[in-house]
């Protein structure tokens, strides 16, 4: 074994070889040196573990090829672009919504230059960062006032901390949802200092349940929109206008967490009814919160809208500063909201809306173009076909809605489909799809036409290895 260690070349010899690699030309020399040292430590560990037992495996040409691959892989940015071919539009693991081009340009402009983030250009005095989107939010939703924090969980936390800290909040037992990542409404409420008062049963809650729970310590009646699941069958929940009327009768504030709330009415496109923010506010509810990066199709943000007296109190909460959004999020959100001033323009230009409302005929045509491209580029490496399938909205939205689509199915001939899947994840720009019936499937709903060539190149590179 000791003789094998002597066959491992020096770091300097590898550096001389790798510094000729144009793909590594921009890599700082010290980082290159450190990565080569890591690779050589790995080689020594392979000898100790008995993985390498023959000196032929330690030939310089063999090790140099491995070292190059190791350095290229380890030196890539950890946060990277991926191609989403899963058909899940608001894919939580892949960054949820992608931004409209107008929002991307607004972010770039705000980053390259100074901005009026907190300056009132009319007076030359200090202004509020919330002013950039508050009027837009009010115009689009009908709210009296609004503000934005860094995500919807933060929005819920801030509302409860401001309006109900140390007092009871009455919520239906069937609405104590988990919002993802093990974050649950009861835990968020506990952190806010509010006291949870559950009423009703999991499947049925009546207005009298809320009324009977109200006592001297009650501060708020809360409703949580269960956008990420449905209870069907023997089920009843209280309509928001009735809850609002009860709150006003008893002198209590009312609050609805819409979760992945939307400003766009999807029902004309065959979707089941889903309340819009505008509809919810028309019920008279005092405060509504919703996400920015789900059905809205903007950046991650928690939007709070409602009656001015409550929003002003929330703005003054010291916790608000810890939860406030930055200039890049504000730039992206304002640009996204401006598109909603014309709903049809929003449907066409906000990628999330365009993907969700894409017509089956359009998707079938795009799948055909992708199939022809892959059939040509992967000839002899895989069989390519199209088949009917379903996409999903994702992001905890429309959980029962299957979206008809046309899938492109790739069945490799020289490797198993899981090896193809893993190989695509290891590409410089990973391609994420789904495996069905022994084939790797691509859904054109979440693919851009400009990505067809990239997908074809990645698949060819993996299948030809």
UniProtKB/Swiss-Prot annotation:
The record's similarity note reads:
Belongs to the SelA family.
Report the protein's function: Converts seryl-tRNA(Sec) to selenocysteinyl-tRNA(Sec) required for selenoprotein biosynthesis.
Q: Tell me one GO biological process term.
A: selenocysteine incorporation
What UniProt keywords apply to this chain's record, in alphabetical order? Cytoplasm, Protein biosynthesis, Pyridoxal phosphate, Selenium, Transferase
Give the record's GO CC terms.
Answer: cytoplasm
What terms describe the molecular function in GO for this protein?
Answer: L-seryl-tRNA(Sec) selenium transferase activity
Q: Which domain of life is it from?
A: Bacteria
Compartmental location: Cytoplasm
UniProt pathway annotation: Aminoacyl-tRNA biosynthesis; selenocysteinyl-tRNA(Sec) biosynthesis; selenocysteinyl-tRNA(Sec) from L-seryl-tRNA(Sec) (bacterial route): step 1/1
Give the EC number(s) listed in the UniProt record: 2.9.1.1
Class of the enzyme per the UniProt entry, highest EC level: transferase
The answer to whether keyword Protein biosynthesis applies is yes
Write down what this protein is called. L-seryl-tRNA(Sec) selenium transferase
Q: Give residue numbers for the modification (N6-(pyridoxal phosphate)lysine).
A: 294
Which SUPFAM superfamilies does its entry note? Answer: PLP-dependent transferases
Taken from the record, one Pfam family name reads SelA
Reaction equations catalysed: L-seryl-tRNA(Sec) + selenophosphate + H(+) = L-selenocysteinyl-tRNA(Sec) + phosphate
Required cofactor(s) = pyridoxal 5'-phosphate
């Amino acid at each position: 074994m000791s003789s094998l260690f002597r066959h491992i070349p020096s770091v300097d010899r590898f550096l001389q070889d790798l510094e000729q690699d144009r793909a590594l030309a921009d890599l700082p020399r010290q980082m290159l040196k450190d990565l080569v040292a890591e690779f050589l430590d790995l080689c020594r560990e392979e000898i100790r573990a008995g993985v390498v037992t023959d000196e032929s495996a330690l030939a310089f040409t063999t090790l140099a090829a491995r070292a190059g691959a190791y350095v290229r892989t380890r030196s890539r940015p950890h946060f990277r672009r991926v191609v989403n071919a899963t058909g899940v539009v608001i894919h939580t693991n892949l960054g949820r919504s992608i931004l409209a081009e107008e929002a991307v340009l607004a972010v770039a402009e705000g980053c390259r230059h100074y901005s009026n983030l907190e300056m009132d250009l009319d007076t030359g005095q200090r202004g509020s960062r919330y002013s950039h989107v508050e009027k837009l939010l009010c115009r689009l939703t009908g709210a009296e006032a609004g503000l934005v924090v860094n995500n919807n969980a933060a929005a819920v936390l801030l509302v409860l901390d401001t309006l109900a800290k140390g007092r009871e909040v009455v919520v239906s037992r069937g609405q104590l949802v988990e919002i993802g990542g093990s974050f649950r409404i009861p835990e968020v409420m506990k952190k806010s200092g509010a006291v949870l008062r559950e009423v009703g049963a999991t499947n049925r809650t009546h207005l009298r349940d809320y009324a009977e729970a109200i006592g001297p310590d009650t501060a708020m009646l809360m409703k949580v929109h269960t956008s990420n699941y449905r209870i069907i069958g023997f089920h009843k929940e209280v309509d928001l206008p009735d809850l609002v009327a009860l709150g006003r009768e008893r002198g209590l504030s009312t609050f609805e967490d819409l979760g992945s709330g939307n400003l766009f009415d999807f029902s004309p496109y065959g979707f089941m009814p889903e309340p819009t923010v505008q509809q919810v506010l028309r019920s008279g509810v005092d405060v509504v919160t919703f996400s920015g990066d789900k059905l809205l199709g903007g950046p991650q943000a928690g939007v709070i809208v409602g009656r001015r007296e409550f929003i002003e109190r929330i703005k003054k909460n010291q916790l608000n500063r810890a939860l406030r959004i930055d200039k890049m999020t504000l730039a992206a959100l304002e640009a996204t909201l401006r598109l909603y001033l014309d709903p049809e323009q929003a449907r066409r230009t906000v990628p999330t809306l365009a993907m969700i409302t894409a017509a089956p005929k359009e998707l079938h045509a795009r799948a055909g173009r992708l199939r022809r491209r892959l059939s040509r580029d992967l000839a002899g490496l895989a069989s390519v076909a199209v088949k009917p399938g379903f996409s999903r909205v994702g992001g905890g939205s429309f959980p029962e809605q299957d979206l008809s689509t046309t899938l492109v199915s790739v069945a490799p001939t020289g490797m198993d489909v899981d090896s193809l899947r893993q190989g695509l994840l290891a590409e410089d720009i990973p391609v994420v799809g789904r495996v069905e019936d022994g084939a790797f499937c691509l859904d054109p709903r979440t693919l851009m036409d400009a990505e067809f060539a990239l997908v074809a190149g990645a698949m060819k590179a993996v299948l030809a290895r």
